[in-house]
């Protein structure tokens, strides 16, 4: 028998009492002993078949401070032995020190036994009373020296067997355990009378250690029941990791269900821990896709297999479900993983104070002085939204100097292409005058043939606009532009050397096809190469050079016949061709084709050799990944969806009223119109004046469009065109009916100047501008291609039928028809066209469609591929 049992036996001197007396006083003494000496009461509602259950799972908080021996199992006492055992229990109750119990908590590991104490564990015999009460005496607390030695031994992790503890845990399933707090149990009576200071300090330490067991009994009981409900507590501890970040890791439930074995579960959990960093800050990590791609060696070989992808669904996240290729996130070694994790932490630090930046600054494509200063001062953060909830996309601040000369060279090269386009478009206006003169040509050009010479170019432009989309996608922006230079030269030479109308028509068709391709590829190249800080200034160059080309054609046509004018047109693409060889392909196209190194070289050329292009390159890669995820196979079916039809219809309506205002008919036939009007001013001089007005009006519109608003300028443009067209119609009506209009020779020129000025202020640039503003981002590229093709179709109809309309209804009828269409267009603008001045793209789309999508950048606009 242990020393504890000897003390109990020596302390009880009551002798043998009758059985009835002992049984009668059992309950009273048990209650008094528990109240006076601080016992904890443990009740059990176990069934009779489980009466051998012990309470060994209720352990002391520290196995050294409260040493206990392995539980001893005894069957139920036979009736003839109960009297003697009850007497012994009564003697022990009077002499034993108070008890203390602690339940098995969640942090305890039953497979990792407590450390062996410095002294031999004492044997303990559980005290039983009426088969439902078990009490264990509490030994005296250790001294400070013993505690220090014990903690040193714990660090060496010397295990002891705990097989009985495991069996006891299993036996407590379904049991009900309650605790009663009694602070008196914290101090044994034998130790309370000591006056020695060291003994008092030891007792105080022991009291503090025991006190922890009485904290929040309800919570302890709840945790105890939760632990007892698990067959494998180690597995419970492993699965507990998934609750560390419930919002970001709820998707792991599906992975845990798929685990058929514990080994598979641990493997899945290790993979999850390696990727768990992505859920730390969902506002940023959805943009950090493929952060660990560099540490994977299998991703390139296995490709984008859908079986290796998982859908991360965050119910309370601000992002849409995001597809991440898990193989791109795998890491071959811990070193690679830690390197990637450090990179992630550096990027994540940008959003640590997002609450103070709920209204970050956004710089639109044209830019402004205030936005430029802000971007130089603080990190440029663009706020974009998805389904009405804010989301942040982080860009680095522009700290590198802007190398203007390289970007000016790129913009100048592209703008020379616009000059060629403007010259080709205006060619028929001065050329048809000399071409229809039998004294200046070797072949006859009938009025019907002349209408085809002017109208075939827009028809070919329609075909070129459709073909330009796949060309810039697969050949590249720069290569596509280069491919148009040689056909421009060939087309002009065909016209210059023509011996019949067929050669002229062939040259015009080839030139029109190149115009359609260039009208789509030139602005795309410029938008993808120029920095936002100078995009507003350099973005004006193509429009200005296009008007210069028109003016040059009008001026040269005054002194040259149609053949010499065509030779001049053949010479213009030569400098354009040479300069295009000096500039690189756009970095964004290289990224879209997976050529990262070439994209880096192109950025270095455009931004400067000493510029840090890595942040911008990574931003391009993230934008391309976004565009690829949003891309759909059938673009045309997407256009026909109900939510997309309204903005597309408005864009097509603006294009329709732009061309049906008769602008191209006026430009193409300016000289003929002034000649028929009998103006006292030379027709060629009038044409030059119209070209100058068109050139100057472009700069006026640039100053007013962001101040007066889109709709105001459209109103002014419509009213100006309506008045001038009806006045011109009245002038030609009076002239055709024999009235004397010689005193009004100045009127046609005045009307043409006002008409061109009004058109250039509103219906000239605004339909193209609003096409990029009101079209939804998801269909912006394909819808823009459709709108461009529709614009060229209307141009062809107007230019081809203008001469027929004059022959059928007279010049006055044609101008009145155009004026009536402009009048209808005024009501179209009032009723259907929204005002977009000062509004973000998200606000515009919310108004148009009733919801918000994340706005893609201009470079994400993909041309229509016509995947029917």
From Swiss-Prot:
Cellular compartment(s): Cell membrane
Cytoplasmic side: 1-403, 473-484, 530-535, 585-653, 706-711, 773-778, 834-868
CDD domains: MFS_GLUT6_8_Class3_like
Metal-binding in keyword set: no
Stretches with biased composition (Polar residues): 342-352
Glycosylation sites per record: 439
Residue intervals passing through the bilayer: 404-424, 452-472, 485-505, 509-529, 536-556, 564-584, 654-674, 685-705, 712-732, 752-772, 779-799, 813-833
Ranges of biased composition (kind: Low complexity): 44-57, 79-91, 117-126
Extracellular side: 425-451, 506-508, 557-563, 675-684, 733-751, 800-812
Keywords: Cell membrane, Glycoprotein, Membrane, Phosphoprotein, Sugar transport, Transmembrane, Transmembrane helix, Transport
Annotated GO CC locations: plasma membrane
Modified residues (Phosphoserine): 259-261, 331, 333, 856-857
Basic and acidic residues composition-biased segments: 25-43, 146-155, 257-290, 353-367
GO MF assignments: sugar transmembrane transporter activity; trehalose transmembrane transporter activity
Region span, Disordered: 1-213, 257-314, 335-367
Keyword Ribosomal protein: no
Membrane topology: Multi-pass membrane protein
Similarity section: Belongs to the major facilitator superfamily. Sugar transporter (TC 2.A.1.1) family. Trehalose transporter subfamily.
Function of the protein: Low-capacity facilitative transporter for trehalose. Does not transport maltose, sucrose or lactose. Mediates the bidirectional transfer of trehalose. Responsible for the transport of trehalose synthesized in the fat body and the incorporation of trehalose into other tissues that require a carbon source, thereby regulating trehalose levels in the hemolymph.
Xref: NCBIfam families: SP
PANTHER family membership: FACILITATED TREHALOSE TRANSPORTER TRET1-1-RELATED, PTHR48021
Name used for this protein in its record: Facilitated trehalose transporter Tret1
